[in-house]
């Protein structure tokens, strides 16, 4: 039976709730009970328990049988390892990150947007120096964070009024005002890369470029990006510009791989 576009977009409630539960457990940083999960996610407790039992059976969560509490399970580690080893984008991006890290002496990352409001680090390369900025694979951030956020906002080309609320929820060490941030987004749209000089994290410069792909019916968008991270005192002038241009051209090359269809 062929499904309509509307039916394909409609989420399967049970699957959606299972994903919500996994995300909640991942963010809790401690084992939690059924009732706490049910209250937090507004799920009927008996339904929540059935989902947790199923996830536990498949190793996606782990139950403390004595305390009757749940946490993420070991199967997710295997999934993560398999994803890093087999995902087409991660493989293609890793070589790019390794080269840029070596050439420009910076830590490099590739991120993938998770849903509409978060990004997750899916690949990285460390700077070949005694001191470098450390980033973990699997780290999650708000989608509009730092220079990478400038790129995603620029690619989405959304109304500024729509962007104001998520912007105000961001955590900055040296926060820009909204108009200045919009100027940074416009810069990213016009130049193909973005720069955050110590706003998100004081003393740290982040340079990023979006990877554009066909997201729906041939319409271009961006759910992935690459970036370089270094100390602001070291990453400036010609070195900063060289990194920006390298990220821009590398992102463009990766974009060509994903411009025709989703991968």
Enumerate the language-model features and the residues they cover.
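A short beta-turn/loop motif at secondary-structure boundaries
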Residues: 64, 113-114, 198-203
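N-terminal helix-turn-helix
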Residues: 1-86, 90, 252-260
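Short, structured helix-loop boundary elements
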Residues: 11-15, 69, 73, 86, ...
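A structural signal for short hydrophobic beta-strand segments in well-ordered beta-sheet cores
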Residues: 61-63, 110-111, 211
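Extended hydrophobic
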Residues: 173-252, 257
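Amphipathic alpha-helical effector-binding/dimerization core
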Residues: 67-166
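Cysteine/selenocysteine-centered motifs that mediate thiol-based redox chemistry or coordinate metal-sulfur cofactors
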Residues: 163-166, 170, 251-263
